[in-house]
């Protein structure tokens, strides 16, 4: 007489679900979702400024760009497994901890890259797809393979990869690259050193242990802080080029960019006053992330007509209050 098939116990099913969740969590950590979110904000900013009005194109561009960035991050993780094992900050990542095999990660990255190219090529255009692939090549080839372990300028030159997402967004919207797109590229390019060098000051011992020649390890915190201030000072006027002479954005963005840039420069000045102060380095790193998010958000808001109406009313009210106070004081 045939036996009755036994059902899996609730405990076994629970263990399987838990194992699946762990695998998904490991692959999620592999792609660095927080970094991708920041990169996609620059893509969105470029699309808003370029005048995108197609929600589907907007979604597909962010999806394809995010998948391309994920592919680059996975390949970088595979290549850097040896040094990640030496660093306290990274030794628990999926590859150095053994939760994911390098071969599986490479297959995953290949699937991601093909998916990104296909999505962008089919639903936007070949220029956007090609730019996304070039971002992977620059990040992996120039930064990870060539410069990261050999030069203090690794994140400066290699930072060009992180500046490509706004080009992808612009190309997906317009089918070409204008001066405004390249100004956005320059903003991200100049933003990268203050952002990563602030983190490198915080993790200096980790990088030194792994033999990675980050600027604070080789040149010290003071020179690094001076370089951070230099790049911050360069970035502020570049960010204003979108207002004049390009005329892409208006007074709302101008005010936001000037305020955010001034705050970033002030954070850099504070760090230069005491380059070994970890709290100041952490504050600069955190604000650098916030700066980029808010700057790109200001680009989108500036393209919204209601923003200019409200902004004009607010500035007129402030001017009226100022005039009244002057009259009362005289």
Swiss-Prot record:
Q: What is its main location?
A: membrane
GO BP, sorted A to Z: heme O biosynthetic process
* Listed transmembrane segments: 30-50, 58-78, 106-126, 127-147, 155-175, 182-202, 228-248, 249-269, 281-301
Q: Name one GO cellular component term.
A: plasma membrane
Which is an annotated GO molecular function term of this record?
protoheme IX farnesyltransferase activity
Compartments annotated for it: namely: Cell inner membrane
Q: In which pathway does it act?
A: Porphyrin-containing compound metabolism; heme O biosynthesis; heme O from protoheme: step 1/1
A Pfam short name = UbiA
Keywords per UniProt? Cell inner membrane, Cell membrane, Heme biosynthesis, Membrane, Transferase, Transmembrane, Transmembrane helix
What reactions does this protein catalyze?
heme b + (2E,6E)-farnesyl diphosphate + H2O = Fe(II)-heme o + diphosphate
What superkingdom does the record give? Bacteria
Q: Which EC number(s) does UniProt give?
A: 2.5.1.141
The record's annotation in InterPro entries points to: Protohaem_IX_farnesylTrfase, UbiA_prenyltransferase, UbiA_prenylTrfase_CS, UbiA_sf
Regarding the membrane, this protein is recorded as: Multi-pass membrane protein
User: What PROSITE patterns does the entry give?
Assistant: UBIA (PS00943)
Q: Which family does it belong to?
A: Belongs to the UbiA prenyltransferase family. Protoheme IX farnesyltransferase subfamily.
Q: Please describe what this protein does.
A: Converts heme B (protoheme IX) to heme O by substitution of the vinyl group on carbon 2 of heme B porphyrin ring with a hydroxyethyl farnesyl side group.
* Record's miscellaneous remark: Carbon 2 of the heme B porphyrin ring is defined according to the Fischer nomenclature.
What protein am I looking at?
Protoheme IX farnesyltransferase
Task: State the species of origin.
Answer: Synechococcus sp. (strain JA-2-3B'a(2-13)) (Cyanobacteria bacterium Yellowstone B-Prime)
């Amino acid at each position: 007489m045939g036996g009755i098939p036994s059902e899996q116990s609730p405990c076994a099913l629970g263990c399987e679900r838990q194992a699946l969740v762990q695998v998904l969590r490991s692959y999620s950590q592999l792609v660095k979702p927080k970094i991708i979110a920041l990169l996609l904000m620059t893509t969105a900013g470029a699309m808003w400024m370029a005048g995108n009005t197609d929600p589907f194109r907007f979604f597909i561009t962010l999806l394809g760009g995010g998948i391309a960035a994920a592919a680059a991050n996975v390949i970088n993780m595979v290549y850097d497994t040896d040094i990640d094992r030496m660093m306290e900050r990274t030794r628990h990542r999926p590859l150095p901890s053994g939760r994911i095999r390098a071969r599986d990660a490479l297959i995953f990255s290949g699937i991601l890259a093909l998916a990104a190219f296909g999505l962008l090529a089919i639903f936007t255009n070949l220029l956007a797809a090609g730019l996304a692939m070039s971002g992977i090549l620059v990040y992996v080839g120039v930064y990870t393979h060539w410069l990261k372990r050999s030069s203090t300028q690794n994140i400066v030159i290699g930072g060009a990869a992180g500046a490509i997402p706004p080009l992808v967004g612009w190309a997906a919207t317009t089918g070409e690259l204008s001066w405004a797109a390249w100004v956005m590229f320059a903003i991200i390019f100049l933003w990268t050193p203050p952002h990563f060098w602030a983190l490198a000051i915080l993790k200096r011992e980790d990088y030194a242990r792994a033999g990675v020649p980050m600027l604070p390890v080789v040149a010290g915190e003071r020179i690094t802080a001076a370089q951070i201030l230099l790049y911050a000072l360069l970035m502020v006027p570049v960010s204003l080029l979108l207002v004049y002479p390009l005329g892409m954005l208006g007074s709302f963005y101008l005010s936001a960019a000037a305020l955010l840039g001034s705050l970033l420069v002030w954070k850099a000045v504070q760090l230069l006053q005491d380059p070994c102060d970890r709290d100041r380095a952490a504050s600069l790193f955190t604000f650098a992330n916030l700066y980029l998010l808010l700057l790109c958000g200001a680009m989108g808001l500036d393209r919204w007509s209601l923003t200019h109406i409200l902004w004009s009313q607010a500035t007129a009210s402030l001017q009226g209050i100022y005039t009244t106070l002057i009259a009362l004081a005289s």
